[in-house]
Amino acid sequence: MARIEILAPVGSEEMLRAAVFSGADAVYLGFSGFNARTGAGNFDADSLQEAVRFCHARGVAVHVALNTTVYGTELPALEQAIRAVAASGADAVICQDLAVATLIGKIAPQLPRHGSTQMSVHTLQGALELKELGFTRVVLARELSLPEVEHITKHCGIETECFIHGALCMSVSGQCYMSAFLGGRSGNRGSCAGPCRLPFEANALPEGKPGRLHHLSLKDNSAIDKLDKLQALGVASAKIEGRLRTPEYVAAAVSACLAGREGRAYDRDLLKNAFSRSGFTSGYLDGKIDGTMFLSLIHISE
């Protein structure tokens, strides 16, 4: 049985070192201008080459995110970005927009393409379509249960990747327009403002129940205890979310995932101290989708 890859987020050079020295098998980082975390310290052509050299010298793979939707006017700059990524020696590109995937196939066909979670692939048919389009891996939607992950993984014919730790979208990744609607900042363009993390007033709660709570904010996903199950299912990679977080967070999350993969105990309190929105949830993978996944004890649907 192949060992599941631990894939760590990188949003700065400090996070890169933290991920590598903590033992990550691979890292993913954004190329400036075309990735879903514009607020991170993203990489240009020169710094990407340095990052790839640093990682490859230590046996760590590098996946580059070009995973925003792209405007037609941006295609010339996108072509330059793809050429820079290919020249860097990166191991794969993560993309959402099919225009990006098509251009990669034309400009750098040797570069493996991974379908971003922003594509919302949540069925076997969706994964098979990506295979037909030449993708070698699909990052499955975070909203899937373990049986759904198993079904897709066993029958899709390409690698699957699952989020194992980090933030959850209150909608479905790639389908939320709340930030764009309320503040003109699109998650699909890499600039989600996270309005779901704010407190909201609920007027329909029973008398005496506080109404102004974080009704829309989900707890962070943490399914490190399920790494052995995902590995047994044949999932290729376990992904840690968090390119906007800190080197300390990356180190804690990678260390916990390595321990979980090997069946060793890990310090859950250390994970909470590194970053936690009032605890963790594994509700999606467990198939238990309810109000306990949210920050507020009183959920708007209760």
Question: What name fits each language-model region?
Answer:
Residues 1-21, 26-36, 51-52, 58-68, ...:
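Surface-exposed amphipathic alpha-helical tracts and adjacent flexible/coil segments at the periphery
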Residues 40-49:
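Aromatic- and glycine-enriched glycan-recognition loops and surfaces
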Residues 99-100:
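Alpha-helix capping/helix-boundary segments
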Residues 104:
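RNase H-like DDE/DDD metal-dependent nuclease/strand-transfer catalytic core used by mobile genetic elements
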Residues 120:
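Beta/alpha (TIM)-barrel catalytic core signal, keyed to glycine-rich beta->alpha loops juxtaposed to Asp/Glu
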